[in-house]
């Protein structure tokens, strides 16, 4: 993973230890790692998960937030759903997929939390993609309906997955 030169310069001036690549970091460095809408953009998924596992301390926590292709808004917008945006999104996840992917690396899915505001934002982006216009009102109601349906199905527009390194 490469970082911008400007971001690196600012970090160094503020006294932050900095590595250009995660491979430069020692094994079991972190108690917690967070990825907010990142994992779906990573080309080599298995390699990335192995690297996360390597970097986490034993019993460390990984927090991953990703879009959920089983949500109502994904089903409503179909090919216009913003999170299906290929090639920007390489991967599309469900709860089962996340569980299986990380179990292969001996990591346990501990908890799944909804990202309720994502349905509104993703619906707005999807409206723009579908119609070419930012239809705030329609996007709001589709986002609202997505969350309402998710109260019964637990399939929110995006989920936060909390995983433990075994």
Question: What do these predicted regions represent?
Answer:
Residues 2-5, 85-90, 132-143:
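Short, Lys/Arg-enriched charge-dense amphipathic segments
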Residues 77-86, 125-132:
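Short glycine/proline- and charge-enriched loop/turn segments
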